[in-house]
Amino acid sequence: MQRLLFTPLTAFLGSPCLRLLVPRVAPRTQCGCSCGIRRPLRPGQYSTISDVALQPGRSTVSLPSKAAERVVGRWLLVCSGTVAGAVILGGVTRLTESGLSMVDWHLIKEMKPPTSKEEWEAEFQKYQQFPEFKILNHDMTLAEFKFIWYMEYSHRMWGRLVGLAYILPAAYFWKKGWLTRGLKGRVLALCGLVCFQGLLGWYMVKSGLEEKPDSHDIPRVSQYRLAAHLGSALVLYCASLWTSLSLLLPQHKLTETRQLLRLRRFAHGTAGLVFLTALSGAFVAGLDAGLVYNSFPKMGESWIPEDLFTFSPLLRNVFENPTMVQFDHRVLGIASVTAVTVLYFLSRRIPLPRRTKIAATTLLALAYTQVGLGISTLLMYVPTPLAATHQSGSLALLSVALWLMNELRRVPK
């Protein structure tokens, strides 16, 4: 009977993955025997085990806390990569004017694409009932419709993949006890934001399917909803990447000086400016403002075009006037690259770790590359490959800005 009870336990504790999680010598009582009452453990005896490891009543053994942090950090890094992919694919979908090809939304039903000719004809007939076909694409063939349909379908399926990448591992890590109390709150917020993002995407598409007051208005999604959709995706991306970097990268113990504090604050402001510039790109895309003035540095024949304030009230121009929207994006882009340049030279005046210097240098190089891509996209009348690369560059620039912020973060005492 003893053999049946204790042999599996011995084999379990003898596995290589658990040898570091238990003491080499079993704790004994004062009398030297191995009875049920144990002496208090010496400090550090279980220093590699998380606070939930080997608790009574648990059927599993938790990973060491540092190992669990690395696993969770890598998971969030992968998640941020999937969000970046969704943003890039969504940008290409917008550039190819494919976003309004799927005129309804079903969480499960639409996962199966049409297969027969009859199903494709039925899908095409649904599309023909909406303004985009009637005004812009009335001579579209079925083959052309299939292309834009598959573009939107790919974006939607990728969005579902993003949801699974967040929710399923989150549930697993929660059950295993690998999430600290602080991480649990963050992970819940991230999963909630993923679900909100999906609903916001359909809310955006609906705006492009509605009949406009003027029957000759170009069908397009609301630039406000497009900016909200992109903005929430960027927030999700930044939050995931920041948490991942905080878990994976060891913190630098930097000497807190006035110069370091100023550099840290300036890095935060620069990252915010980069975020705002990327967000303004949604208004440029939503209004096709990149096709208004295709010259640089001037806009047409002047530095400040005359049609900046054609709408009334004046505030409407900031969000609805294509000329003003392009002008704002130019100004924000120039302000961003200027801020990155100043940040780089400020970082050179302070003794910083090598990894932090690499982040600052990479940020500078990416900023000027992004400006070059933006100017080229403008001068070449927004070709899809170049415009998609420019959008991807904004994500790369934002990522490195977050990396530099993470390098400069204050170490808690």
Curated annotation (Swiss-Prot):
Superkingdom to which the source organism belongs:
Eukaryota
Which residues are recorded as binding heme b? H329, H390
**Is Iron found in the keyword set?**
yes
**Membrane topology reported for the UniProt record:** Multi-pass membrane protein
Which controlled-vocabulary keywords does the entry list? Heme biosynthesis, Iron, Membrane, Metal-binding, Mitochondrion, Mitochondrion inner membrane, Oxidoreductase, Transmembrane, Transmembrane helix
Q: Where does heme o bind?
A: H155, H229
The cofactor(s) it depends on are: heme b
> Which EC number(s) does UniProt give?
1.17.99.9
Which GO cellular component terms, listed alphabetically, does the Swiss-Prot or TrEMBL entry include? mitochondrial inner membrane
| Topology Mitochondrial matrix: residue spans | 1-70, 175-186, 251-271, 348-362, 406-413
Q: Which InterPro entries match?
A: COX15/CtaA_fam (IPR003780), HemeA_Synthase_type2 (IPR023754), Peptidase_S1_PA (IPR009003)
Span-the-membrane segments of this chain are: 71-91, 157-174, 187-207, 230-250, 272-292, 327-347, 363-383, 385-405
Kindly state which reaction or reactions the protein catalyses.
Answer: Fe(II)-heme o + 2 A + H2O = Fe(II)-heme a + 2 AH2
Q: Which Pfam families match?
A: COX15-CtaA
Which pathway does this polypeptide act in? Porphyrin-containing compound metabolism; heme A biosynthesis; heme A from heme O: step 1/1
A biological process from GO: heme A biosynthetic process
**Which GO-annotated molecular functions does the record name?**
metal ion binding; oxidoreductase activity, acting on NAD(P)H, heme protein as acceptor
> Where does the record say this protein resides?
Mitochondrion inner membrane
Which regions of this chain are Mitochondrial intermembrane-facing, per the record's topological domains? 92-156, 208-229, 293-326, 384
Instruction: Provide the family line.
Output: Belongs to the COX15/CtaA family. Type 2 subfamily.
The free-text domain note is: The N-half (TM1-TM4) and C-half (TM5-TM8) domains are connected by an intracellular loop. Each domain is formed from four-helix bundles and they align in a pseudo twofold symmetry manner. The N-half domain is the substrate heme O binding domain and the C-half domain is the cofactor heme B binding domain.
| Job description of the protein | Catalyzes the second reaction in the biosynthesis of heme A, a prosthetic group of mitochondrial cytochrome c oxidase (CcO). Heme A is synthesized from heme B by two sequential enzymatic reactions catalyzed by heme O synthase (HOS) and heme A synthase (HAS). HAS catalyzes the conversion of heme O to heme A by two successive hydroxylations of the methyl group at C8, in a reaction that involves matrix ferredoxin and ferredoxin reductase.
Q: What is this protein called?
A: Heme A synthase COX15
From what organism does this protein derive?
Bos taurus (Bovine)
